[in-house]
């Protein structure tokens, strides 16, 4: 697996890096569309089964120890640090794997393992990244069957990700 990550990083991700930097993502119909090179990187990594590296097999992951994810992440970062920021955020799923209900794990972890990207919503205007100073409030709306958020986030890491890990009180 590490050899495959190295090959994909060297043969696909690295050659795409310069073009991705020049072209960048675009907003189309209020949605972020990755540069073609980034989209190709995601597709190739997903087809190779390299999302969900540390997640349990029952969700489609490889069940690797974190050390292997860190090593793989370094290989991807060497090829393209910008893409590493997208691919590496699969680590958000570790929080779900640790704390989510089984229903939530089935819903979200399988999607990460299939190549859907994650976003990390932590930073706030008056708190920065001081996690204890977070003011965003969350409450469950029984009538709608969903969580409602009240507050402000900024500098969302990979804000266009399919699955967001939001820090709230």
Region locations from a protein language model:
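Structural motif
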Residues: 50-53, 117-119, 146-147, 164-165
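Flexible loop/turn segments at secondary-structure boundaries
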Residues: 59-63, 92-95, 104, 126-130, ...
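Short, flexible loop/turn elements at secondary-structure junctions
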Residues: 49, 59, 124-126, 142, ...
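Short, surface-exposed charged micro-motifs
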Residues: 42, 135-139, 155
């Amino acid at each position: 697996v590490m050899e495959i990550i190295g090959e994909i990083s060297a043969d696909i991700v690295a050659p795409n890096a310069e073009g991705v930097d020049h072209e960048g993502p675009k907003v189309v119909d209020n949605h972020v569309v990755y540069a073609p090179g980034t989209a190709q990187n995601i597709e190739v990594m997903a087809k190779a089964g390299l999302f969900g590296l540390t997640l349990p097999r029952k969700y489609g992951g490889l069940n690797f120890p974190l050390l292997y994810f860190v090593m793989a992440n370094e290989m991807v970062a060497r090829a393209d640090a910008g893409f590493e920021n997208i691919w590496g955020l699969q680590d958000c799923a570790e929080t779900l794997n640790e704390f989510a209900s089984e229903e939530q794990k089935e819903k979200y972890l399988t999607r990460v393992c299939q190549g859907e990207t994650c976003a990390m919503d932590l930073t706030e205007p008056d708190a920065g990244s001081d996690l204890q100073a977070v003011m965003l409030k969350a409450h469950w709306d029984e009538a709608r069957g969903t969580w409602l958020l009240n507050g402000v986030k900024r500098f969302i890491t990979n804000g266009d990700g399919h699955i967001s890990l939001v820090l709230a009180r």
